[in-house]
C-alpha cells in the first residue's frame, strides 16, 4: 500500500531555516551519502538533512537523511530515509538543525504514516501543530512508576497463565496463519474499551501486503472508524520491506514517539505493537555495514545491545501513564541463541507463544498455555489464589500432554480412573481457554466476550474442583465466563432431548 505521501508540512521545516546551513553531496554509496559543509558549520549527529532539487530527467527530488558520523575534513556521513535514485554529486543539502520530527497527538489516530511522519493513506494532510523529535532519552528514574501491576487484557488464557505487566514488554511468537493479527486487533479493541487507552502499530520491515491486510481488517472490525476518523483507536506507522535500511531502522522510533506523547501529555495507557522487532535489528545491521563498522557475532552490528536498549528503555511506565509493548519476534532458523532474538529476550517480561496445533484444533486464541511465560506469575504479585489456579491448570494440561501417546496407542479405556478424570478436565480446560473475540464478530457471527480476571479464576477453579465434571466438553468451547458454559450445557441438553 505504498501510496505517495500526501503533501504535508510534517517534514522538517525547510523554509523556516532560511537555508542558513548548506552543504553539498560529495559521495553517494547506495543509501549512504557523504556531505561536505563549510568549516565551522557541521551538523550534529542525528540531525535531519534535506536534499532538494531535480534529477537528470527533470523530476523533483526530496530526500531526507539522518547524520550518523562526522568524518573530518568538514564532511558528514548520513543515511537516507528514502530511495537515493536520481541524486548526483554536488547537489545542495540543507541542514534542518534538528532531528527528524513527527506529528503526535489525536490527529494521528486512524491514519497511516511513513518514517518521516508523512501520511501515506491519501486522506489529506495531518494537523502538524504538535510534533516531537524521534530521538529522546528514556524517562529518568525519578519519573518511573515502579509499582508492579497486571495489565488486564480480558483474554482468559493471557490473564490467567501469562499475565502482562502494565508498562512491560511482551514477545509474541508464532508462524503464519495462527492468529497473530486477530490477537493484536483484539488487544487494541480491549485497551480502548476497558482502559480508555489508544494503540500505536509500528510495522517494521513488514510485507506491504500484510500491512494493507491489517489496515483493511481494522476498518472492517471498527478499530479504525472510517466515518469519524478521530474516533479510531490506533495510529499506524509503516516502514515496509522495500524501504531503504535507514527507514526500517527508524520507523520503530517514529511509532514509539507517537506512543510517548499519548503517555506523557494525554496521560493514557498505550499499547505499542512492533511487528517485527527482528527487522529493526536487521536494518541496524545493514546500516552498520554501510557505515563501515566492523561486524560482530554472526555478522550483526557491534552496537546491537546499545541500539536495542535505547529503543526498549523508552518503553516503560511513568507517573503519567504507561506504554505496554507487544513485539512480534521472528526467530531466524528457529535458533533462539541467535544474537538478535537473544538480545530481545533480555528485555521481555512475558512471552505469548501461538501454537499451530491449537489453531488446527480450532481453539482460538491459539495461545500455547504451557509454552507461554510471564515474570508476573508470582504469588506475591498476582496473589495466592491466581497463582495456585494457574499452576494447577498447567499441571493438568501437562499430565494430559504426557498421556496423549498412551491414548493414541491404547485408547482412553486403558487409563486409570484418576487419569481419565484428569484427561476429561484437561479437555474442558483446553476448550475453556478459547474465547470469542469482538474483532472476529464480523467473521464468526458470535458476539465477543471480555472476561475479567476474577471471573477467569473463578471459572477455572470450578473446573478443577470437579463441580462441572458432568457437563459435556463442547459446552466450554468459545464461551466467555463459566456461567455461559453452564447455560450452554443446559441448551445442549435441551437440544438433545428434543432430537430424541
Curated annotation (Swiss-Prot):
GO terms for molecular function: ATP binding; ATP hydrolysis activity; proton-transporting ATP synthase activity, rotational mechanism. SUPFAM superfamilies: C-terminal domain of alpha and beta subunits of F1 ATP synthase, N-terminal domain of alpha and beta subunits of F1 ATP synthase, P-loop containing nucleoside triphosphate hydrolases. GO terms for cellular component: chloroplast thylakoid membrane; proton-transporting ATP synthase complex. Its EC number is 7.1.2.2. The keyword Ion transport applies. CDD domains: ATP-synt_F1_beta_C, ATP-synt_F1_beta_N, F1-ATPase_beta_CD. It is a peripheral membrane protein. InterPro entries: AAA+_ATPase (IPR003593), ATP-synt_VA_C (IPR055190), ATP_synth_F1_bsu (IPR005722), ATPase_a/bsu_AS (IPR020003), ATPase_alpha/beta_chains (IPR050053), ATPase_F1/V1/A1_a/bsu_N (IPR004100), ATPase_F1/V1/A1_a/bsu_N_sf (IPR036121), ATPase_F1/V1/A1_a/bsu_nucl-bd (IPR000194). It holds the Pfam family ATP-synt_VA_C. It comes from the Eukaryota. It is found in: Plastid, Chloroplast thylakoid membrane. ATP binds at residues 174-181. The keyword Plastid applies. Keywords: ATP synthesis, ATP-binding, CF(1), Chloroplast, Hydrogen ion transport, Ion transport, Membrane, Nucleotide-binding, Plastid, Thylakoid, Translocase, Transport. It catalyses: ATP + H2O + 4 H(+)(in) = ADP + phosphate + 5 H(+)(out). Belongs to the ATPase alpha/beta chains family. F-type ATPases have 2 components, CF(1) - the catalytic core - and CF(0) - the membrane proton channel. CF(1) has five subunits: alpha(3), beta(3), gamma(1), delta(1), epsilon(1). CF(0) has four main subunits: a(1), b(1), b'(1) and c(9-12). Produces ATP from ADP in the presence of a proton gradient across the membrane. The catalytic sites are hosted primarily by the beta subunits. This is ATP synthase subunit beta, chloroplastic. The lineage of its organism: Eukaryota, Viridiplantae, Streptophyta, Embryophyta, Tracheophyta.
